[in-house]
Structures are given as C-alpha cells and as structure tokens.
C-alpha cells in the first residue's frame, strides 16, 4: 500500500529500508535533538536504533514502520511498537 502525497511516496517499510531509515533517523537526531541529551542519552538512543532485537522485531512484523520517500531517498519514518505505541517519528 503506497500513497503519493505531493510527489512523495508514503508506504510500509520493507527490509531494504531498515538501514537507510535508521541512518536518516540517526543523522536527524544528531542535528536537531542530541543537544538536549546527555552523552549517555545519545549513546542509549544510538544503541536503541542499532539493536539487533529491534531489527528482528521489525522483520517479524512486531515493530512496524512507515517511510516517506522523495524518489529513492528516505526523508521520514514513523514506527509503532506493540501495535499501539508510537516509537519513532522522524
């Protein structure tokens, strides 16, 4: 299910989207959010988005993610944990 909005594609993430999405999330976090976090908080966030268990949950459908694309570049992502908890929104 893909939806085009203003020339952008919004769809459920596929396995191939995981690494580019996490990279975009990390870069965005560092640019806009990290200033408000302690070094420990920054490390914890990085560990969260690079955790193999999180990726495994995504592959099993227990951690759902949508991506917004401008062509082939991921420019946004939103994920849901446990089917009802917004986990990441970038």
Predicted regions and their residues:
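A short helix-loop-beta-strand connector motif used in the catalytic cores of GNAT acetyltransferases and
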Residues: 49-66
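Hydrophobic "lid"/C-terminal helical patch
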Residues: 21, 25
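Conserved acetyl-CoA binding element of GNAT-fold acetyltransferases
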Residues: 82-90
């Amino acid at each position: 299910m893909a939806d085009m909005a203003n020339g952008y594609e919004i769809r459920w993430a596929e396995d191939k989207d995981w690494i580019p999405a996490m990279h975009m999330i990390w870069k965005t976090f560092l640019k806009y959010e990290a200033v408000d976090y302690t070094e420990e908080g920054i490390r914890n966030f990085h560990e969260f988005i690079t955790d193999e268990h999180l990726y495994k949950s995504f592959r099993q459908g227990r951690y759902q993610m949508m991506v917004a694309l401008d062509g082939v570049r991921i420019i946004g992502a939103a994920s849901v944990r446990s089917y009802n908890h917004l986990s990441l929104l970038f």
